[in-house]
């Protein structure tokens, strides 16, 4: 979690408004019990040790995903953090926990299908905005914009089920370093790469 702390701190210093870290996916439950338990222990340690600093730095913490399925101590620590930072107005730090892009799209489709079945909505009237509103970043966190830049560390060339709908026009950077070794310097390199690009949003 040291890398995460450094990146959160550096994002705040750079004036970045939104930062989302993919901490635990819906697929990660398939890992060994020991590995899953270790991830949650690290999460609880980070939240408990850095809560005061997050509050002092005006960082607001949000969770994307159903964190209530996590172990009780993790849920308790997260809920305390969410409550203690809910009125902060600086960097919004989103932690994706028990989150999956396909999972939230499926739930959005189900919710819209129910409206169609009840006669509240015609299929031809379904819009991109309606789907976006039913996603985790819409229904629960309407103020979270689509990501401009996605940084995938360790040289892996895939999104791993992360914000699939929202990342339609995101710029992607793939540093070769592993996440624990991802430094503020590497972070700034990725940002500089992004800033050198011309965003086209599918126009050409």
Language-model segments: residues:
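Flexible, compositionally biased loop and terminal segments
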Residues: 1-204
């Amino acid at each position: 979690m040291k890398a995460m702390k450094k990146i959160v701190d550096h994002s705040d210093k750079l004036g970045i408004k939104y930062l989302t870290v993919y901490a635990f996916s819906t697929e990660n439950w398939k890992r060994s019990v020991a590995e899953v338990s270790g991830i949650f222990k690290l999460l609880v340690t980070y939240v408990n040790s850095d809560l005061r600093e997050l509050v002092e730095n005006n960082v607001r913490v949000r969770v994307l995903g159903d964190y209530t399925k996590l172990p009780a101590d993790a849920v308790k620590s997260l809920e305390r953090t969410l409550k203690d930072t809910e009125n902060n107005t600086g960097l919004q730090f989103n932690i994706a926990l028990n989150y999956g892009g396909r999972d939230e799209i499926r739930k959005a489709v189900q919710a819209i299908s129910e409206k169609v079945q009840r006669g509240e909505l015609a299929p031809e009237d379904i819009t991109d905005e309606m789907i976006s509103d039913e996603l985790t970043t819409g229904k629960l966190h309407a103020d979270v914009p689509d990501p401009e830049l996605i940084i995938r560390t360790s040289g892996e060339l895939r999104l791993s089920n992360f914000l699939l709908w929202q990342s339609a026009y995101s710029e992607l950077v793939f540093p070769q370093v592993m996440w624990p070794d991802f430094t503020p310097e590497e972070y700034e390199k990725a940002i500089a790469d992004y800033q050198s690009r011309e965003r086209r949003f599918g126009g050409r």
